[in-house]
Amino acid sequence: MQDFGQWLPQSQTTADLYFSSIPIPSQFDTSIETQTRTSAVVSSEKESANSFVPHNGTGLVERISNDAGLTEVVGSSAGPTECIDLNKTPARKPKKKKHRPKVLKDDKPSKTPKSATPIPSTEKVEKPSGKRKYVRKKTSPGQPPAEQAASSHCRSELKSVKRSLDFGGEVLQESTQSGSQVPVAEICTGPKRQSIPSTIQRDSQSQLACHVVSSTSSIHTSASQMVNAHLFPPDNMPNGVLLDLNNSTSQLQNEHAKFVDSPARLFGSRIRQTSGKNSLLEIYAGMSDRNVPDLNSSISQTHSMSTDFAQYLLSSSQASVRETQMANQMLNGHRMPENPITPSHCIERAALKEHLNHVPHAKAAVMNGQMPHSYRLAQNPILPPNHIEGYQVMENLSELVTTNDYLTASPFSQTGAANRQHNIGDSMHIHALDPRRESNASSGSWISLGVNFNQQNNGWASAGAADAASSHAPYFSEPHKRMRTAYLNNYPNGVVGHFSTSSTDLSNNENENVASAINSNVFTLADAQRLIAREKSRASQRMISFRSSKNDMVNRSEMVHQHGRPAPHGSACRESIEVPDKQFGLMTEELTQLPSMPNNPQREKYIPQTGSCQLQSLEHDMVKGHNLAGELHKQVTSPQVVIQSNFCVTPPDVLGRRTSGEHLRTLIAPTHASTCKDTLKALSCQLESSRDIIRPPVNPIGPSSADVPRTDNHQVKVSEETVTAKLPEKRKVGRPRKELKPGEKPKPRGRPRKGKVVGGELASKDSHTNPLQNESTSCSYGPYAGEASVGRAVKANRVGENISGAMVSLLDSLDIVIQKIKVLDINKSEDPVTAEPHGALVPYNGEFGPIVPFEGKVKRKRSRAKVDLDPVTALMWKLLMGPDMSDCAEGMDKDKEKWLNEERKIFQGRVDSFIARMHLVQGDRRFSPWKGSVVDSVVGVFLTQNVSDHLSSSAFMALAAKFPVKPEASEKPANVMFHTISENGDCSGLFGNSVKLQGEILVQEASNTAASFITTEDKEGSNSVELLGSSFGDGVDGAAGVYSNIYENLPARLHATRRPVVQTGNAVEAEDGSLEGVVSSENSTISSQNSSDYLFHMSDHMFSSMLLNFTAEDIGSRNMPKATRTTYTELLRMQELKNKSNETIESSEYHGVPVSCSNNIQVLNGIQNIGSKHQPLHSSISYHQTGQVHLPDIVHASDLEQSVYTGLNRVLDSNVTQTSYYPSPHPGIACNNETQKADSLSNMLYGIDRSDKTTSLSEPTPRIDNCFQPLSSEKMSFAREQSSSENYLSRNEAEAAFVKQHGTSNVQGDNTVRTEQNGGENSQSGYSQQDDNVGFQTATTSNLYSSNLCQNQKANSEVLHGVSSNLIENSKDDKKTSPKVPVDGSKAKRPRVGAGKKKTYDWDMLRKEVLYSHGNKERSQNAKDSIDWETIRQAEVKEISDTIRERGMNNMLAERIKDFLNRLVRDHGSIDLEWLRYVDSDKAKDYLLSIRGLGLKSVECVRLLTLHHMAFPVDTNVGRICVRLGWVPLQPLPESLQLHLLEMYPMLENIQKYLWPRLCKLDQRTLYELHYQMITFGKVFCTKSKPNCNACPMRAECKHFASAFASARLALPGPEEKSLVTSGTPIAAETFHQTYISSRPVVSQLEWNSNTCHHGMNNRQPIIEEPASPEPEHETEEMKECAIEDSFVDDPEEIPTIKLNFEEFTQNLKSYMQANNIEIEDADMSKALVAITPEVASIPTPKLKNVSRLRTEHQVYELPDSHPLLEGFNQREPDDPCPYLLSIWTPGETAQSTDAPKSVCNSQENGELCASNTCFSCNSIREAQAQKVRGTLLIPCRTAMRGSFPLNGTYFQVNEVFADHDSSRNPIDVPRSWIWNLPRRTVYFGTSIPTIFKGLTTEEIQHCFWRGFVCVRGFDRTSRAPRPLYARLHFPASKITRNKKSAGSAPGRDDE
């Protein structure tokens, strides 16, 4: 296909420029060789007789004809000519013979002499093989080109021409006016067109779609009609005047849709339709300004839009002249009118030197036949005499600059041949039909041309690719030579121009056979031809180069409307330019200085090699040529000139890669039409060298790309044959372009404006991914000053996506809607969406549009709440966690201390309230020591991390079963007694079994020694109680396994001392010289939570060399009558009967002691009457056994209790006398020296501390008060009593007085007692933690206590003072710090929190110091390991991992456990960490933190629960609860996030930072109970998801509930939860019945089940109950209690929702607990006697088994410890609150039964029993006859674990039991008589604690904890391993839903 412009011969007499875009589909045979002959103007070309008609006197006449008979004859005349009415059917002209135009040789000169100005010769480019070469004959340099000669010759005779159109064979001929000579060039298409070689088909095709714009609704001639009919014969083509069907607005929308769907078919169908009756003048007369759409816009425009385009074209001062010429010379094309406003400072070199206002029409002979179609200069009869041809060319072009406002060309981003759709925002492209292409009608090959500005030396505009002085014109030398694939390599003056043609077959899809529609306002090849022909003899600086693309696709652009006027766009290959409307002059003005540019444009330079986009700022006030009009428009003052610019110049590299229509354009309004030579040159240089893409900013009023309907599949495939030839660039003239380095971002110019983006990247995705792109492109765009806008950088979006803000709406929203409605087509296919390849670079739709790697969908990031930490809290945290942070204490002034104390008081109240309520609902969870070693707890915290407690506890049980402890030979079982613990875990002696005698000192003098019981407590009233026994024997250092210090370790439940208590180990010497070391044992307390009582415990430690050990038999034989082996229950009853106080039973049972202030005086009675007689110790006394304590003469247990618990009610009763604590003998009690010393010691220890030891026992001490808190007394306040600092100081004085009193005592240095911090972090003055390593001096002891914070901090660093030396020797140097040793390489996990400088220690040296001070003592029984850790250490990791597989994370945990054990052996030589109990809390914390895998939370758990230090771990439950309750303030949450919707809670360490400074003053007991209650509360009520807020006792103060409640008020009611079903039965009638009935026959109870009816015998005996008091209101309380007990009567699947009045519940909390205390404690419901109504008496007892989805309730029998069924079972632990239970099987039930058994035979009819074990009726008869039932034993968890478990057993619930695995599988037969009178309880079986309690009401939860039990696992007594529950006990709902058929199979562990 040859140059489209070749077969559009131009007349030298025509000077008007016309815009035309002719769509030619693939059906049109484009292989037309045209031969343009211009007799006087055009040529250097050889004239052909076949291509011209003879001249007449008036001008040149051109005729275009084709097979369809379309003929256009254009003549030039001096006068006005008639316009062609496209609405009228023209008369057909007889077909003329079509012949092939001959190829002209350049050997003959043209008729017109060439310009005298020589043009440097350029080298000829080698053409590709197989193609003809079109070479222009070389001429002499002095000979002017023929075009110029012709132009000069014919300038005076320029006339208008007429066109003749032949639609359907009829020829419309219009003669020119007389006097004008119009040579006629005929372009014929005939049969010869097939003779062109097929190689031509490889060249590109340029598809030009045209629409006729008309104000009428009639359909005018369309481009498809003309194209399919071969509209343009080569011989009949008019001189550059082409029919512009692109701008037809008269087409119906259905035609738009048809054209969109099938453009080719549309063209073909309308090829022979005539236009109508309207003339061209009428058509354009009806057009409105700015409303001439192109092919795209015509589809997207509404018919209601004004189409008066002539008014727009003629808006200047010379509108009339232009209108006349337009009507005569422009047929369906936009003639570029002259601009009367001409810049006054135009330079001569720029062809703008002359005022264009004076020469508006000086265009004659400027644009000759060398110019391709679409543009030509309008004929102007008035020519200034001073204008030469060269100047006229530039003037004409300059006129276009000022009169045309659109110059758009944009890159294509089509990536494939298929599915190429027209994209919104794409610019029109400059396409010309290649007439050389013959025989390519099927291939549809098109050519795309680009226009580039190239700077040259002389500053003249010339067409790129022009030859030198010779006749070589690769582009435009001949019509048949300029459009080949040959490229221009030799440009004059080093012009860098590219012209390439490529052809590829279009897709078979007919929608793809329509090439880009070219607006008639497009600067086409014809224009460039004319420029080249006119300026080839002049070394012009300004050249227009045409470049084609290598890319595959040419995407059709669309129109953007501005101010209601369509903005035609043209897009082409690299630097392709379209010149819509009035901007042809831009093609010649390469750079123009703008008078007032507010902002400089920016250029985006794309570098394909790096795939990056760079912004470059152009020079100040510089704008490229095609930007000129847009910039000049900003300064246009004439109201008639309302012009805007919308243009983009796009590289060819991005052609064919656009897959979506989001090609972006930027707009800039033209300013005043003044130009500058320098600026023009500078811009030209930039364009030439960098091949920039010029993209002015988007017009702010333009429509976005999403608002314009798309036109489908208008694109052109371009083959890859493109060859680019480039000459070496010569030095550019003008202002040089600023070069930027790769990756360098230019500095943006101008000020950003609102709604715009300055310097944004303007790039499409495909432009960065096209592999064919090999040249860098740049984009520059400037601001739009007229609209006060700045160029918005927008980038193309992905396929099918629209870029918001890419194009600002240019039309009203209503117009856009109308457009969209008009083009609706139900048959139109959607845009194809191609999937993004993995890792592809895709546009990011951010504000500034950065290019980011595509990584798929980004997850929504959840915001995490943050704690609002105040500076005082942060400072206090540092002080508490870092003992060496004494310098920070300076920041704590009195105001801060006062404020912090107020905060502590607030939290004290919150904690007390929380514990009280939780105690009421969740049961008693006060401290009760478990056995176990420190290593057990360390491994335990490994297992409890990030998993629920039931899984972690099962994992530890599995380890204990897999690696059991090897039995020791010295162990022997002890007799069953209340205070003994056997080796097998039943019960042990009071002081343990491993106690050994050290000589016979204790045995010989035990009877002669009076034991002194001394309770100690710190100044803050901690719950630490020590029972110190002082016996006199020489060399006796201590008792069962603790160091020889009085306050070395308070009892396990007493380690909460916040104040360090200085003890007096070996400080008292008897008269006989015997010294008794008084020591304490941290695990020496035995407590019974079942009866709220405690026993003595003695723990054996690893240091045996200095211990005085004695067996339980020794104690029992010497100190207690053998006949008085009272059981645990008997002791409790004894105490209750002997209680003389007026306290109620529950208050006396509060630790088993009457809490009466009147008994305070008995403190000394119980101590001084030790030698009288012996009574059994009450089990509820939480004494700490130290030293050789003997209890020979206790009057009775109540006296002892009263003596120890004297100070219990000190806070409640302010009338406590001070004399109660004086050491004076009580009347009636003999006072000897020993007892006085004991009394004095006891009194001293009430307030003993590290302060000065001055004697002043003037004030009572609250040590005992806080040591013994009632477990169940509701009359006692749950607030922990604390003493003031004054009392503390007074106690210090009392201690000092005691020391002085015994100043003559001999203290043995070898037995010196070192105190040790037992409570962990003992804070003094509320700020610091004190260590207790203070020796007790015989004479005077320095006052180590100081309220000064700095001194306290310094004292904290004195952890190991005197550990390795004798206390007496080092007593004066008490404040010396222990020697610090370098680290031995042990792993330090992290620096201590809050520590400014981490101190490292040799941990093994620390252990050695402890051993040196205390000796190598043997471990006590309570400190024994639960697992054989040495075996685990030697085992393989896989074996350990398999053992804990059920827990999860087993591999990692197995490695950590083994690494930990290996470290112990490597560092210390053995697996033993018991020495940590005697190390300072800070040192212990640092050591634990150094263990790999332990964090702060885990370390705090070990310290609080095992080491009994002052600590408070914050786990997920605690953190969540504190946030929800509002205890921890949060930073403001986002508006969209409410507290009850919060998912990401703050970091646990931050929560702990806030809490610990406020909780550090609490004692260890309170912290323990608070922690235990909180973790249970988090499992039962405040779960992570769906918390049970309706039943929560804390919801009145809960902010989470308030937030949820406030939100729920606005929400619609939702469906009720499955687990919460409101019962329609009244609550009273539903629940007011007895659960535990033992007076009726047991058989009736056993026979009752869900399958049997209510037997009458169930109600034979009345249900009576004894009220707690005679007051009638207690009946109401009984009703409440009954409601709690029995609420599952009507339907086992229903869980009644009891809505409580929470306000009333909160107010009456304590009174409610007191009123129901008897029932809650141990009210025996089977013995209740009360008259009830007959209705209640008729309610049957609950079922034996009640199955629900989440839990299964079983009615069980409570077995006493002496029950015959328990023979062979381990005896229950004394402190275990849970008894053994018996679960009864229903007859016919099996271990795998999930449903109630049914009768399966007809035994009643036959009278014979079947043998089926699942038949309910037969088995019921058998069991009734045998008087036996089947049952499964339930074992208390503490007893099952033998009282030993990590972390003090907090894994388990206080009421948790295990199902015996053997009896669960094979039930045991139980005689009915054995369970006849046993009380009945309820056990809740489930998979976990949260699932069991999910959805229960407050009463039901309370009943479960106080009356019932929970069970989540089975227990194999043989292997001692956990087992899953059998289906009979509970079958998980999850397994039922998964496989209902396998309901009978054995269930595994459920993970609900």
Swiss-Prot record:
GO terms for cellular component: nucleus. GO terms for molecular function: 4 iron, 4 sulfur cluster binding; cytosine C-5 DNA demethylase activity; DNA binding; DNA demethylase activity; DNA N-glycosylase activity; metal ion binding. Its cofactor is [4Fe-4S] cluster. InterPro entries: DME/ROS1 (IPR044811), DNA_glycosylase (IPR011257), Endonuclease3_FeS-loop_motif (IPR003651), HhH-GPD_domain (IPR003265), HhH_base_excis_C (IPR023170), Perm-CXXC (IPR028924), RRM_DME (IPR028925). Changing residue 1357 to F: In ta2-4; increased number of aleurone cell layers in the grain. Disulfide bonds: none annotated. It is found in: Nucleus. Its main location: nucleus. Residues 72-157, 693-778, 1302-1334, 1367-1398 are annotated as: Disordered. [4Fe-4S] cluster binds at residues 1582, 1589, 1592, 1598. Binds 1 [4Fe-4S] cluster. The cluster does not appear to play a role in catalysis, but is probably involved in the proper positioning of the enzyme along the DNA strand. One of its GO terms (biological process) is base-excision repair. Keywords: 4Fe-4S, DNA-binding, Hydrolase, Iron, Iron-sulfur, Metal-binding, Nucleus. Its EC number is 3.2.2.-. Reducing ROS1A activity may be a potential tool to increase aleurone content, and improve the nutritional value of rice grains. Aleurone cells are rich in an array of proteins, vitamins and minerals. Disruption phenotype: Sterility and inability to set normal seeds due to severe defects in both male and female gametogenesis. Expressed in roots, leaf blades, leaf sheaths, apical and lateral shoot meristems, inflorescence meristems, lodicules, pollen grains, ovules and seeds. Expressed in vascular tissues of roots and leaves, pollen grains, pericarp, aleurone, and starchy endosperm. Residues 90-102, 130-139, 1388-1398 have a biased composition (Basic residues). The keyword Metal-binding applies. PANTHER family: DEMETER-LIKE PROTEIN 2-RELATED, TRANSCRIPTIONAL ACTIVATOR DEMETER. Bifunctional DNA glycosylase/lyase, which excises 5-methylcytosine (5-meC) and 5-hydroxymethylcytosine (5-hmeC), leaving an apyrimidinic (AP) site that is subsequently incised by the lyase activity. DNA demethylase that is indispensable in both male and female gametophyte development. Involved in the regulation of DNA methylation in the promoters of RISBZ1/BZIP58 and DOF3/RPBF, two transcription factors that functions synergistically to positively regulate genes that are key players in the development of aleurone layers. Belongs to the DNA glycosylase family. DEMETER subfamily. This is Protein ROS1A. It comes from Oryza sativa subsp. japonica (Rice). The gene is ROS1A.
